[in-house]
Structure formats: C-alpha cells, structure tokens
C-alpha cells in the first residue's frame, strides 16, 4: 500500500467524516425506538417512525459504518506501524467491535419493534441510547490522548 502513503491524511479525513455520520445515526436511531415504544398504540405514528428507522439504518448508518471500516482498514494498511504505537489502538479496535455489535443489535431491535412494539419499554431504549455515547467518548480519548 506504499503507493497510497501520500494519501494517508485524505483517508483519515474521510474516516473522520464517516465516523461522524455513523455516530450521528447511532445516536438518533435508538431515539426513534423510544418514540416507537411510547406510541405503540398509534398505528399511523408507528408507521412513520418505522420508515424513518429503516431509512436511517439502511441509507445512513450502514453505509457510514461500511465507509468507516474501509477507511480505517485502509489507514492500517497504509501505516501498519500504527500497530506498534501502543495498546491504545488495540483498545480502540476492541471498542469499535462493540460499536459494530451495537449497530447490528439495532437492526434486531427494529425487527423486534416491528413484531411486538411492547416487547421492550421506552426506558430500555433510553438507557440503550447511551451506549454509543460512552463508546465514542472512550474511543476519542484513546485516539487523542493515547494513554498507553
């Protein structure tokens, strides 16, 4: 990947853009789940929220996740020495795996809400909504501070 080494900062910039888009979607999607659960008895409202959930997941969250992964892997291929820069990168990658699990669990929640909107209450989704925020904070600290 030496031929791409001159483009590392461009790849990094697009990685940051993709991460911001992915995180925005992961912050908002569970909020839609809250509205869905709170208004399960309002079929018209639920219909609109379901469309929003599907579009957000399919057209924003998933492509942003894919682009985040592609640019992240590309950065590691361009600069494999980053693996030797300390444990912070390994910890960050572990947290990214947790974000991926969260992302796909959101799809599971969408399916569950579609089948039974009363399965989990709005409080569950409010707490669930905090997980990507915590992961993002930890990832940013690891990337910027590189504490180990």
Swiss-Prot record:
Binding site for heme: 15, 92
EC number: 1.3.99.-
Bilayer topology term: Multi-pass membrane protein
Reactions that this protein is recorded to catalyse: protoporphyrinogen IX + 3 A = protoporphyrin IX + 3 AH2
Cofactor-binding details, from the entry: Binds 1 heme b (iron(II)-protoporphyrin IX) group per subunit.
Cofactor names: heme b
GO function terms (MF aspect): metal ion binding; protoporphyrinogen oxidase activity
Source organism superkingdom: Bacteria
BP GO annotations: protoporphyrinogen IX biosynthetic process
Disulfide bridge partners, by residue number: none
Function, in words: Catalyzes the oxidation of protoporphyrinogen IX to protoporphyrin IX. Is involved in the biosynthesis of tetrapyrrole molecules like heme. Does not use oxygen or artificial electron acceptors such as menadione or benzoquinone.
Protein family per UniProt: Belongs to the HemJ family.
Protein name listed in UniProt: Protoporphyrinogen IX oxidase
Organism: Helicobacter pylori (strain J99 / ATCC 700824) (Campylobacter pylori J99)
